[in-house]
Amino acid sequence: MIEALKEIAKQNPQGFTVDLNLNPVTSGYVIAVPETQNCFGDQGLEKVLEIARDNGYCIGGWLNRENGRFYWDASLIVRDLEEAKEIGRKFNQIAIFDLDEQREIWL
């Protein structure tokens, strides 16, 4: 699965979110979970995959344009905006991502 996720990241360098079956998640609000904050490289991907599997989270990745690093996240998908904002704040996130509109929502 690690190699498949790397290939998805290679094909989607600006970012992606997939479920544990590697199907694209295209709707809802993405909230990165704190346990996988600042995960990058192979070691970071392994940690993200383990946490996602253990908790039923989705897996995502995105390119930080400021430092050129590709970050991996285990993510929770929520359908309700207010609930997503509340969880995002609880997780100390500065933003969540709206998959439907393809935009960040700053908290």
Can you name each region flagged by the protein language model?
Residues 1-107:
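Conserved, structured core segments of small domains
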